[in-house]
Regions:
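Functionally constrained cores in energy, signaling, and assembly domains
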Residues: 85, 135, 148
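Accessory cap/linker subdomain of secreted extracellular hydrolases
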Residues: 2-130
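Conserved alpha/beta-hydrolase "acid-adjacent" motif
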Residues: 146-152
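Short beta-strand/loop motif that positions the catalytic acidic residue
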Residues: 138-141
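Catalytic histidine neighborhood in serine/cysteine hydrolases
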Residues: 135, 161-172
Length: 172
């Protein structure tokens, strides 16, 4: 229920950091039309188990699910690029942290992307939750979902409070 923008930013961050830590940091995971197969992603992750654990902890994803989530995010982002002609978000201003001694190296060397202005505006206009509720909404979630972190729902709760419609919103 958070803006799709924030979920896709998380996906972009995950892909560029994966590319830096496990692949060749060449942008292929985003820049090429061909998909990197999930088995190949898993093989690259399996070669660096300590990094995989750090990566999984940072993104709140179990190590066993990393390849699947990275593959899925790659698919979604490449589809968005093909539909809208570019990324609706970028990482030019992103400062990465949470990787300990690697933070400086990641920030210095990770591949950076500019947002496409048309795609960015399209997402703002069409995929941003308003928080304006006129009927009851029940958000059901678990404490672990590899694609949608619990914080996703916390965002929407705040937006409904701002719009004075939180009495229509409940989480479980």
């Amino acid at each position: 229920l958070a803006p799709v923008y924030s979920l896709m930013r998380r996906a972009l961050d995950m892909l560029v950091i994966y590319d830096y830590l496990f692949a060749k940091n060449n942008g292929r995971i985003l820049d090429e039309k061909a998909f990197i197969e999930q088995d190949r992603i898993k093989a690259q992750i399996d070669k660096k188990q300590k990094l995989a654990t750090l990566f999984g902890t940072h993104f709140m994803i179990k190590v066993d699910h990393l390849a699947e989530v990275i593959s899925f995010n790659q698919f979604v982002i490449k589809e968005i690029i093909s539909w809208l002609g570019g990324l609706p978000y970028g990482n030019i201003q992103t400062i990465y942290s949470g990787f300990g001694d690697l933070d400086e190296h990641i920030n210095k060397n990770v591949k950076r992307y500019e947002p496409n202005s048309f795609a960015e505006e399209y997402y703002i206009q069409n995929y941003s939750p308003t928080g304006e509720l006129y009927d009851p909404v029940l958000a059901l979630h678990t404490t672990y979902d590899q694609l949608l972190p619990v914080s996703n729902y916390e965002y929407y709760e705040q937006v409904t409070k701002i719009k004075y419609s939180s009495h229509y919103y409940a989480q479980q």
